[in-house]
Amino acid sequence: MTQKILNPVTGRFVKVDGSTGKKIKTGNIYDVNNILSSKLTKKIFDKIRRNDLAKEERETQQLTKKISKGIFDKIRSENKKYEKNTQKLTKKMVLDIFSKIYKEDSRKSKTQCVVSEKKDNGGVLLTEDLGKIFEKSICMLYDTPYIGPYKYGNEKPMLLKTRLTKLLDFFPELTHTAAGGALHDFTTKNSRYLSAKTSKKKDGKVAPQKIGQPTKKKFLEFFNLPPDTSNDDIKLFIKKNIVRILDEYFKYTFDDTIIYYNEVNNIIMLVKTLKKVKFDPNLIEFGCNKPGKSWKESTILFYNNKRLGEFQIHTSRSCIKFRWFFENILLLFPDNFEVTIL
């Protein structure tokens, strides 16, 4: 068998006896430079690959550092924001009456209770109905008869009763005395009084006793106004005599200690008046006096830019209503009240 050797120029095997076989195509003068041994090619490729990998690693490290810096900057920013917000919240809580509330630790109450939105007969539960249910729960706590008609069952009052046991520490005994629109909801043997107030909404609006929702006739009689006074004249009277009117509403609301239940906020608190609020007329503003506003049927009363109360004079109903934004008045005058969470 004829031996063959490798021609380094062409990269082809040729016979040892000198036979060239097929004619060799030399082509371009630079073709020889383009023919590299596999070993050299591998070296060059490995070098290129190492350089590329090193470059990629450097870029990756730079990118990682950049991303990490961005992440840590974001974390620091969020921490600063959190600290700032926390400081604001803390300051607000110190100023607010609810700093008192939180000191009482409302979480001590193990039983949470929210009264159903429906009556037993399937109708919508009104605020007045919730008030009767709440009074019934107090009657059950003190084992005293509920005075007046009651048609809402005992299941909901029993749930609320479990939240009220701490009330016994403040009023060892109570009797229900709310029949016929009486001034006091509950009375003790030594003539101490307790008023029960409820709200089904977050804003916590409550009306004063007796004069909070009177007929137009009774409103006019109470404030010694002519019986033929028009609604527009009543509105004008309210605006001109607002401090006097608020003083009367305050007396008929806060003369008694108040047991207050807000169903939406799921909170029950005992509120005792320490001193009468002195309303500054310069801080009072009627919402209807703001640009683009008017007093049609209702208007919001602001005090120091916070909602204090709401007046309602309906054209279709002969009544003059006023309701406090109850929790707001506690916030506005924290030194005037002692608040205890039950």
UniProtKB/Swiss-Prot annotation:
What is catalyzed by this enzyme? Endonucleolytic cleavage of DNA to give specific double-stranded fragments with terminal 5'-phosphates
Q: Which GO terms describe its biological process?
A: DNA restriction-modification system
Question: What does the pH dependence annotation say?
Answer: Optimum pH is 8.5-9.0.
The answer, when asked if ATP-binding is one of the entry's keywords, is no
Q: Name one GO molecular function term.
A: type II site-specific deoxyribonuclease activity
Q: How does activity depend on temperature?
A: Optimum temperature is 23 degrees Celsius.
- Its protein name is Type II restriction enzyme CviAII
Organism expressing this protein natively = Paramecium bursaria Chlorella virus 1
Lineage, please?
A: Viruses, Varidnaviria, Bamfordvirae, Nucleocytoviricota, Megaviricetes
